[in-house]
Amino acid sequence: MVGKMADDMVKEQIYTIPLREVRKVPAWKRAGRAVKEVRGFLVRHMKTEAEQVKLDKTINECLWEKGCEKPPLSIRVRAVKFADGEVQAELAQ
C-alpha cells in the first residue's frame, strides 16, 4: 500500500468477494455494478464509509478485463484498514 505507513495499519485481511449477483443486472451494466459490489462488500466487512474505500487500479482492470458484459464470478482482494478509517484495497496475489 503506497502512501501510508505500516505503523498506521489497524486491520489487514484477504477476502474472496462473490460477484454472482452481478449476472442478474443488464449485460451492459455488469462491470460497473461489480465495482460497486466490491466497494459495498468492503464497507460492510471493514466497517467504514463508502467514501473512505480506495480501490487499486488492478481491481478495476481485473473487473473490466473481458469487457463490461463479462466480469469474473469472484475476486480475491487484499484490504488494509488504517487508523483514520481509510481502507485501501488491491488485487491479492
UniProtKB/Swiss-Prot annotation:
Alphabetical list of Pfam families matching this protein: Ribosomal_L31e
Coiled coil stretches, renumbered: none
Sorted UniProt keywords: Ribonucleoprotein, Ribosomal protein
GO CC terms: cytosolic large ribosomal subunit
Cysteine-cysteine disulfides: none
GO BP annotations listed: cytoplasmic translation
Gene3D superfamilies (alphabetical): 3.10.440.10
GO molecular function, one term: structural constituent of ribosome
UniProt similarity note: Belongs to the eukaryotic ribosomal protein eL31 family.
Record-given protein name: Large ribosomal subunit protein eL31
Organism name: Methanosarcina mazei (strain ATCC BAA-159 / DSM 3647 / Goe1 / Go1 / JCM 11833 / OCM 88) (Methanosarcina frisia)
